């Protein structure tokens, strides 16, 4: 068997067009400058996959100014609090806003306008509940006495992201006699958001839900885009559904109670956006990582906003991960193998993604697809964020191969990977690579 894997599908992307920099989508150059017009429209690529291959055409689609501009909205609303910045996830009649700002739980109208029935179920965990459950209940019920709020408190941790824990959500929903007009609210990090979203997608064949992410990881990544699900003992996120929320409310004040390790974990996903599609953002991160680690409010707000803009644009173009969206999984194939092989909860998700990103970058360099300077810059920025760049000693080549064989990106028995290729800010999603480079990377990082 040849050492070269092959695939008919290869995808090349760059940074978001709204950032006024030249780039590539599916290997084709976009205009050098794409900006907001006076009519409030921005050009956007329309991507179609047909029998003859990929075709890209330029269309003009309405996008709310809040999703296309780079200026933070600092206006003061009627409540006396600053109005949030809004990033729109453009999915036609299923579009929804991401509200970003401080003191958003003190602006109850933001949540209440997305609750359409009279019953709400808050899904949270035993770490977040003592800190924010009462505040969210107040935000849902202040001036809104007809709404009835129930809650279910789950154990905290990735190891509880399973079917047994999910059943506790269904038990509470059924015991509370919730109907199809109810709303589920995910209050917590990525584990809670994924489980609550999957519960909402499944309960009575689908009810509304809202995301209130409380970690950097959830705020910049998992709460946006509608990926929901649970883990299986044989692999991470193998059971789930695409199911979009009514809105995402990101109150940056919630990060004040986030442990340092959880804070750093989230920055792995932030760095990812710079590597795969937004080189200018990566350069900003290199200069501002210390401010982010010190929880500088303005730096955090900007990093969250820019990350959400990147995620929202990709999701708007490829909701169901048919190609473009898969590139958001840089480092995740290796990272998921680490989480599964080492044991769920031993490392935080972002820690595993950081180490997985280093492996993906190493493999990209072995393929001669990137310059060695990029390898060093990735190591340096992850070290700044105090994230791991080596593997747990117990990980073996055999463990990686076993777990990656059932990865969601395997197609017809072929493992497709997200790798960097070209200048910083460009990547490919492909199965067309020299298998020896993958083997060499695995043996370089594993002791056996």
Describe the residue ranges of each PLM region.
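Residue-level signal for inorganic ion chemistry
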Residues: 101, 122, 213, 251, ...
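Non-catalytic interfacial helical region
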Residues: 170-187, 196-211
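C-terminal charged capping/lid subdomain of soluble metabolic enzymes
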Residues: 51-76, 81-87, 262, 268-271, ...
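A glycine/threonine-rich phosphate-anchoring loop and its flanking beta-alpha core
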Residues: 198-291
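ATP/NTP phosphate-donor binding region
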Residues: 2-183
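Short glycine/serine/threonine-rich phosphate/pyrophosphate-binding segments
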Residues: 191-198, 219-220, 336-337
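Active-site segments that bind and position negatively charged phosphate/pyrophosphate groups
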Residues: 283-399
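Solvent-exposed alpha-helices and their adjacent loops that cap or buttress functional pockets
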Residues: 114-115, 177-179, 202-204, 231-232, ...
């Amino acid at each position: 068997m040849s050492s070269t894997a092959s695939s008919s599908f290869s995808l090349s992307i760059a940074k978001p067009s709204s950032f006024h920099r030249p780039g590539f989508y599916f290997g084709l150059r976009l205009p050098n400058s794409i900006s907001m017009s006076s009519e409030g429209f921005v050009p956007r690529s329309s991507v179609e996959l047909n029998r003859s291959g990929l075709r890209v055409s330029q269309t003009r689609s309405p996008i709310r100014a809040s999703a296309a501009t780079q200026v933070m909205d600092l206006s003061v609303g009627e409540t006396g609090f600053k109005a949030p910045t809004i990033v729109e996830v453009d999915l036609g009649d299923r579009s929804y806003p991401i509200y970003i700002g401080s003191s958003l739980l003190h602006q109850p109208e933001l949540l209440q306008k997305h609750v359409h029935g009279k019953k709400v179920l808050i899904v949270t965990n035993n770490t977040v509940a003592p800190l924010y459950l009462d505040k969210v209940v107040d935000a849902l019920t202040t001036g809104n006495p007809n709404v009835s709020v129930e809650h279910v408190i789950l154990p905290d941790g990735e190891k509880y992201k399973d079917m047994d824990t999910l059943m506790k959500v269904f038990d509470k929903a059924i015991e509370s006699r919730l109907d199809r007009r109810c709303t589920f609210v995910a209050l917590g990090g990525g584990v809670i958001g994924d489980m609550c979203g999957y519960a909402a997608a499944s309960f009575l064949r689908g009810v509304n839900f809202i995301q209130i992410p409380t970690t950097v990881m959830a705020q910049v990544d998992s709460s946006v885009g509608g990926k929901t699900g649970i883990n299986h003992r044989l692999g991470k996120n193998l059971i789930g559904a695409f199911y979009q929320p009514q809105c995402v409310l990101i109150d940056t004040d919630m990060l004040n109670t986030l442990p340092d390790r959880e804070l750093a974990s989230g920055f792995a996903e932030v760095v990812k956006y710079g590597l795969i599609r937004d080189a200018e953002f990566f350069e900003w991160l290199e200069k501002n990582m210390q401010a982010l680690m010190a929880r500088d409010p303005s730096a955090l707000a900007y990093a969250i906003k820019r990350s959400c803009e990147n995620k929202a644009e990709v999701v708007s173009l490829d909701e169901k991960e048919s190609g473009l969206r898969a590139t958001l999984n840089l480092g995740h194939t290796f990272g998921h193998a680490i989480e599964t092989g080492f044991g769920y909860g031993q490392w935080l998700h972002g820690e595993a993604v950081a180490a997985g990103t280093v492996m993906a970058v190493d493999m990209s360099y072995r393929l001669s697809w990137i310059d060695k300077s990029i390898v060093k810059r990735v190591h340096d920025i992850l070290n700044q964020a105090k994230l791991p760049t080596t593997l747990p000693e117990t990980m073996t080549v055999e463990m990686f191969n076993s777990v990656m064989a059932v990865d969601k990106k395997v197609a017809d028995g072929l493992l497709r990977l997200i790798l960097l290729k070209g200048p910083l800010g460009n990547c490919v999603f492909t199965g067309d690579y020299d298998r020896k480079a993958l083997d060499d990377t695995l043996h370089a990082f594993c002791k056996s």
